[in-house]
Swiss-Prot record:
Membrane topology: Multi-pass membrane protein
Assembly: Monomer. Homodimer.
Source domain of life: Eukaryota
Listed SUPFAM superfamilies: Calcium ATPase, transduction domain A, Calcium ATPase, transmembrane domain M, HAD-like
Residue ranges crossing the lipid bilayer per the database entry: 105-125, 139-157, 297-316, 329-346, 734-753, 764-784, 805-824, 843-862, 876-894, 910-930
Keywords from the named record: ATP-binding, Calcium, Calcium transport, Golgi apparatus, Ion transport, Magnesium, Membrane, Metal-binding, Nucleotide-binding, Translocase, Transmembrane, Transmembrane helix, Transport
Stretches of the chain found on the membrane's Lumenal side: 126-138, 317-328, 754-763, 825-842, 895-909
Catalytic activity field: Ca(2+)(in) + ATP + H2O = Ca(2+)(out) + ADP + phosphate + H(+); Mn(2+)(in) + ATP + H2O = Mn(2+)(out) + ADP + phosphate + H(+)
Annotated protein name in UniProt: Calcium-transporting ATPase type 2C member 1
Localisation per UniProt entry: Golgi apparatus, trans-Golgi network membrane; Golgi apparatus, Golgi stack membrane
Length: 953
């Protein structure tokens, strides 16, 4: 019978078609699900019942775990069932960031044409086509397409910051559901889920912890705190959990478990987490327009205004003189189109692109072209402390032994490079027992490991291992066998281990302890002094307390160390001072920047003592400086903060929201703000600042994507080079504007005067086209690659409100234009004495204007320095461009086929020498003006040095 049973079952199913079997199985599955629903009455009906709320981390930290579980209707041990999870997900959504679909790429491309200068050029191109000036139309269109495409590519590349946030969410996690531990996707989590954490895990959502064993979480990417936070499960009083760093019973999404294990209940997912707050701020924040973009917009509007003004004036005068109105309109529009510098956008783009290439050589990646120039008018740098001004590598710098010896420790980071120096002598191994006992205790009572200069474990423990490596004692960790361990907790604030030496296992066990001085000293009854063990007196306790206070006031994190046979009978060994040290070269860069008129402010999540100590070491903080906390910022309105923010050097306990508020206040005061940072907590501020600067090595992906510039080797000094580059680029753009506008105005005036005064036209159409090519061609373009003046870093940042067309620049443009017009008209009048226009007349006039152009370009290479001071051949591209233009002009004059096209004839050597002498006047006058200006500056310098400028923020 048993043998027949399987066959009979198979025979039973054989009677029915396959679709009937499927229907039967589906019915059983539905019945099972209905039973589950009946069993779990907590499942709310989507239409009739209230959905599970989302708790804020602040509220959840104040409540007992049982109350949190009750509010979230969760079972801490068994977790949620799958039906409940599905229903909650339908309401709360996936545990991910919803990056909304942006407008199509073609719309983004079209939006680039909204620039006033681009719109003006478009109008010029259309008019050129209507007037059959196809050469102009093609050149203008090509210029527009190049500029618009470059701007589009830069903008597209910069819009990745929101997508990068999702990378900090772990793809998978361990979650308890229906009483079973599951390996599930982090995006599947919902409020009320139970999550298990262990070493190396990245927290998948905001969790209210209900179990924690020696749990330590690295929150530096979110809060800026260097030291991993020890976590507990007890409720937190409302008065003590104001900032994220103080919520010790919450594990935040995106942070990293450094030590221990824990369980927590999900209180916030996706955008409802603290990480989500950063995401929403980034989504709402728009990158501000750069000063150069504002200047270009203003210049475009000014040129539009002047162009329409010219059209109106010429038409009015022509009408008053009785000329044909349509003919006058045609002439005036042609002149206005010719006067518009279509080469300006290309020169700006090329100049910025070359600046970006030079910055790459200096180990800085600039993601947005205009940002290079913006650095030139930056007058405030807000810098994150951790990882930017400091290395984010905890390092022991001071040792104080129980018998009063003080040792200094050199070297930085988790490596053996450095020395321990006592009274000028280098200490190594067991040469100094007082020091070596401290190092031994710190090395043995330690769970950290350093491999290939990379730390695995807590930063403070890594600092102690690095200290042992410097003394050649790091092998002590393997010399002892650990028998018992008393893990660190935030309540007891110490860690201890009970060990025996591998070679002396028959001897009594020895305890090693490290931790907060106030706690360790309670377990000590004796202290070491010059090889002897003496009873610990109150006088000695006071001495150690005083030394600990001094180290703390210097911004050091102080650890006490002890050893002995039992926890209650320990011998006090001494103190070590640990700090996250400043980066090499930062102090020098800070000094140079401050001297050049740039104010630097430190913004950090660290404590006031640590922040002020580091700022003092870097020269950012003095006795007269102020420091403000994040809580104080919250208590101020925008007006109050705007008044106080220029006077503050250090902002401590600052969250991403505080950083945003600080930057907005500075910008409201008219400052151009650069923000440096490396963590997720910096991303929003980096995007809001005029210039966001991220660290390349230590920076998170989110931070790098939100930034405008990335320092490849994390060198703060590179910012100084970038500012120098920015100032130089702006000078080059001004040089180009001066040259092109002076030449354009001269050509415009020359033809306008001839038209309005019924003179014969001094230049024919082909000659005007050739001049237009030179105006926008190689000589003009080469001004954009003029080497950066090394003196520029000493100049104060320019006011971003200033137009490119300053009064001084307009004066120089007009002077050059007047000289060119007068000189060219003089030649034309001189050749026209016979009252008959011949090819020689136009050739002399044409060549005169071209030579004026070359000398005008030469004088435009610098607004302040003499041509001989900067070097005639320092800009090789300029030399080649001018030489090429002159060769082209000579071909036009002497090459027969071109003579027919341009209606020219050969000139004598004396003619050329006469023209060279006359046209050099524009350069000579410009050099005289520079000399007068420099002399005036020297006289005014003592007066101006005593007055404050707009830069002092």
């Amino acid at each position: 019978m048993d043998n027949l049973l399987p066959q009979s079952r198979f025979s039973y199913f054989k009677k029915y078609p396959i679709h009937a079997i499927r229907k039967y199985l589906s019915m059983l599955r539905n019945q099972k699900e209905e039973e589950q629903v009946a069993r779990f009455q907590k499942i709310p009906n989507a239409e009739n019942e209230t959905m599970i709320p989302v708790l804020t981390s602040k509220k959840a930290s104040e409540l007992p775990v049982s109350e949190v579980a009750s509010i979230l209707q969760a079972d801490l041990q068994n977790g949620l069932n799958k039906c409940e999870v599905s229903h909650r997900r339908a309401f709360h959504g996936w545990n991910e960031f919803d990056i909304s679909e942006d407008e199509p790429l073609w719309k983004k491309y079209i939006s680039q044409f909204k620039n006033p200068l681009i719109m003006l050029l478009l109008a010029s191109a259309v008019i050129s086509v209507l007037m059959h000036q196809f050469d102009d139309a093609v050149s203008i269109t090509v210029a527009i397409l190049i500029v618009v495409t470059v701007a589009f590519v830069q903008e597209y590349r910069s819009e990745k910051s929101l997508e990068e946030l999702s990378k900090l969410m772990p793809p998978e996690c361990h979650c308890v559901r229906e009483g079973k531990l599951e390996h599930t996707l982090a995006r599947d989590l919902v409020p009320g889920d139970t999550v298990c954490l262990s070493v190396g895990d990245r927290v998948p959502a905001d969790l209210r912890l209900f179990e924690a064993v020696d749990l330590s979480v690295d929150e530096s990417s979110l809060t800026g705190e260097t030291t991993p936070c020890s976590k507990v499960t007890a409720p937190q009083p409302a008065a003590t959990n104001g900032d994220l760093a103080s919520r010790s019973n919450i594990a935040f999404m995106g942070t990293l478990v450094r030590c221990g294990k824990a369980k927590g209940i999900v209180i916030g997912t996706g955008e409802n987490s603290e990480f989500g707050e950063v995401f929403k701020m980034m989504q709402a924040e728009e990158a501000p327009k750069t000063p150069l973009q504002k200047s270009m917009d203003l210049l475009g509007k000014q040129l539009s205004f002047y162009s329409f003004g010219i059209i109106g004036i010429i038409m009015l005068v022509g009408w008053l003189l009785g000329k044909d109105i349509l003919e006058m309109f045609t002439i005036s529009v042609s002149l206005a189109v010719a006067a518009i510098p279509e080469g300006l956008p290309i020169v700006v783009t090329v100049t910025l692109a070359l600046g970006v290439m030079r910055m790459v050589k200096k180990r800085a990646i600039v993601k947005k072209l205009p940002i290079v120039e913006t650095l030139g008018c930056c007058n405030v740098i807000c810098s994150d402390k951790t990882g930017t001004l400091t290395k984010n590598e905890m390092t022991v710098t001071h040792i104080f032994t129980s018998d009063g010896l003080r040792a200094e420790v050199t070297g930085v980071g988790y490596n053996p490079f450095g020395e321990v120096i006592v009274d000028g002598d280098v200490v190594h191994g067991f040469y100094n027992p007082s020091v070596s006992r401290i190092v031994e205790a710190g090395c043995v009572c330690n769970d950290a490991v350093i491999r290939n200069n990379t730390l695995m474990g807590k930063p403070t423990e890594g600092a102690l291992i690095a200290l042992a490596m410097k003394m050649g004692l790091d092998g002590l960790q393997q010399d002892y066998i650990r028998k018992a361990e008393y893990p660190f907790s935030s309540e007891q604030k110490w860690m201890a281990v009970k060990c025996v030496h591998r070679t002396q296992q028959d001897r009594p066990e020895i305890c090693f302890m490290k931790g907060a001085y106030e706690q360790v000293i309670k377990y000590c009854t004796t202290y070491h002094s010059k090889g002897q063990t003496l009873t610990l007196t109150q006088q000695q306790r006071d001495l150690y307390q005083q030394e600990k206070a001094q180290m703390g006031s210097a911004g050091l994190r102080v650890l006490a160390l002890a050893s002995g046979p039992e926890l209650g009978q320990l011998t006090f060994l001494g103190l070590v001072g640990i700090i996250d040290p400043p980066r090499t070269g930062v102090k020098e860069a800070v000094t140079t920047l401050i001297a050049s008129g740039v104010s630097i402010k430190m913004i950090t999540g660290d404590s006031q003592e640590t922040a002020v100590a580091i700022a003092s070491r870097l020269g950012l903080y003095s006795k007269t400086s102020q420091s403000v906390s994040g809580e104080e910022i919250d208590a101020m309105d925008v007006q109050q903060l705007s008044q106080i923010v220029p006077k503050v050097a250090v902002f401590y306990r600052a969250s991403p929201r505080h950083k945003m508020k600080i930057i907005k206040s500075l910008q409201k005061n008219g400052s151009v703000v650069a923000m440096t940072g490396d963590g997720v907590n910096d991303a929003v501020a980096l995007k809001a600042a005029d210039i966001g600067v991220a660290m390349g090595q230590t920076g998170t992906d989110v931070c790098k994507e939100a930034a405008d510039m990335i320092l490849v080797d994390d060198d703060f000094q590179t910012i100084m080079s970038a500012i120098e580059e920015g100032k130089g680029i702006y000078n080059n753009i001004k040089n180009f504007v001066r040259f092109q506008l002076s030449t354009s105005i001269a050509a415009l005036t020359l033809i306008s005067l001839a038209t309005l005064m019924n003179f014969p036209n001094p230049l024919n159409a082909m000659q005007i086209l050739w001049i237009n090519i030179i105006m926008d061609g190689p000589p003009a373009q080469s001004l954009g690659v003029e080497p950066v003046d090394k003196d520029v870093i000493r100049k104060p940042p320019r006011n971003w409100k200033d137009s490119i067309l300053t009064k001084n620049l307009i004066l120089k443009i007009l002077v050059s234009s007047i000289i060119i017009v007068c000189g060219t008209l003089f030649v034309f009048w001189r050749e026209l004495r016979d009252n008959v226009i011949t090819p020689r007349d136009t050739t002399m006039t044409f060549t005169c204007f071209v030579f004026f152009d070359m000398f005008n370009a030469l004088s435009s290479r610098s607004q302040t320095k003499s041509v001989f001071e900067i070097g005639l051949c320092s800009n090789k591209m300029f030399c080649y461009a001018v030489l090429g233009s002159i060769m082209g002009q000579l071909l036009v004059i002497y090459f027969p086929p071109l003579q027919k096209v341009f209606q020219t004839e050969s000139l004598s050597i004396l003619d050329l020498l006469f023209l060279l002498g006359l046209t050099s006047s524009v350069c000579i006058v410009a050099e005289i003006i520079k000399k007068v200006e420099r002399s005036r500056e020297k006289i005014q310098k003592p007066v101006s040095s005593t007055s404050s400028s707009f830069l002092e923020v």
